[in-house]
Amino acid sequence: MEETNQDNPYNLPVSLTTLGECAFQNCTGITRVCLPEGVTVVPRYAFATCIKLSGVVLSKQTATIEDWAFAGTALTGISLPATVTSLGDNVFHNCSELIGVQSYPTTAPAITATTFSHDKGTIKEQCRLFVLPTASSAYDSWKNYFKAVVADLTVQ
């Protein structure tokens, strides 16, 4: 996609079901995106280095977030719907503004050692993971990547 300098939410067509790899990579003007309900996969590099992207609403049908999907963005938080089963390598690499991740799956999605990587360790120093109280122990493998795990979400 061509670079856009719009400083507002990017409205995707509700009929959209598939994003291509690198679909919005380097679109520096996008600040917020709401993915339509038909989108189940956020592909590799889909929003990588969209340096002003601070907010994303994932489809309630999202199952997979692939490698580097949100790397280098300005995301401050993200809510993973209950349907998410996996997050790839470096999904949130160098997302230095990320302070909160809400994860609604009752079974922790599969992640890699680099899903929440940051060159300076900022994510671990400042970011909290919020999960359902009944799912807290399912996220034991995630604890090393966050400042704290808070079990206080309510079912969506």
Give the positions of each predicted feature.
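Short, aromatic/basic amphipathic alpha-helical patches
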Residues: 114-120, 137-151
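Consensus positions within tandem repeat domains that build extended binding/scaffold surfaces
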Residues: 20-23, 43-46, 66-69, 88-93, ...
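Structural signature of tandem-repeat unit edges
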Residues: 1-18, 28-41, 51-64, 73-86, ...
